[in-house]
Amino acid sequence: IIPDIVFYVPNTFTPDDDEHNQTWRFYVEGIDEMGFHLTVYNRWGETVWESFDPAGEWDGMYGGKLVQPGVYTWTAWYKERDSDGKKVRQGFINVLR
C-alpha cells in the first residue's frame, strides 16, 4: 500500500502582531522529508524565504523587515516516499496586514 500524499496550503496570512495567523506554513504528509524544498518569491521573482523542512514556518520577514502586503508565489519540490519520483507544486500566498 502506498500512502496518499496530502497537502494543505493556506493562501493567506497576516503577520501583524495580533497573535492570530502570524506565520505561514505548508502542511504535507506522505512524502520523503529529506527530498523537500520550498521557496517563496516576491513579484519580481526574488526568493524571500525558503525551507528544507516541511514543518518550517515563514514569519513574513525578508531582509530583517516584514514584507509588503501583496501576493507572493511559492514552489515546493518533493520526493515520493516509495519511489524516486520528484514532484513540483506551485501556488500563491496573500500577505495582509
Enumerate the language-model features and the residues they cover.
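Short loop/turn motifs at secondary-structure boundaries
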Residues: 1-97
